[in-house]
């Protein structure tokens, strides 16, 4: 079983965790409808990069 040799300080723990935070999702405005959507994702009404890709 793995057991640590020496205790890691709060500072070292914090330094290790400094890159773990999540960033906010990148949003873009659709050229045809002006709707906000996530990057590289189809909008709610079925448009992707200005073209209709999903017919509902």
Swiss-Prot record:
Pfam families: Ribosomal_L32p
GO cellular component, one term: large ribosomal subunit
InterPro entries reported for this sequence: Ribosomal_bL32, Ribosomal_bL32_bact, Ribosomal_zn-bd
The UniProt record lists the keyword Ribonucleoprotein: yes
Comp. bias regions, Basic residues: 7-16
Compositionally biased residues, Polar residues: 21-31
BP-aspect Gene Ontology terms: translation
N-terminal signal peptide: none
Disulfide feature: none
A GO term for molecular function: structural constituent of ribosome
Region (Disordered): 1-39
This protein's UniProt keywords: Ribonucleoprotein, Ribosomal protein
The keyword Mitochondrion belongs to this UniProt entry's keyword annotation: no
UniProt record similarity statement: Belongs to the bacterial ribosomal protein bL32 family.
This protein's name: Large ribosomal subunit protein bL32
Organism: Shewanella piezotolerans (strain WP3 / JCM 13877)
């Amino acid at each position: 079983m793995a057991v640590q040799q020496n205790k890691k300080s709060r500072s070292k723990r914090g330094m290790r965790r400094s890159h773990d935070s999540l960033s906010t999702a990148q949003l873009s405005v659709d050229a045809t409808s002006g709707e906000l959507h996530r990057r590289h994702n189809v909008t709610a009404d079925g448009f992707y990069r200005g073209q209709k890709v999903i017919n509902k």
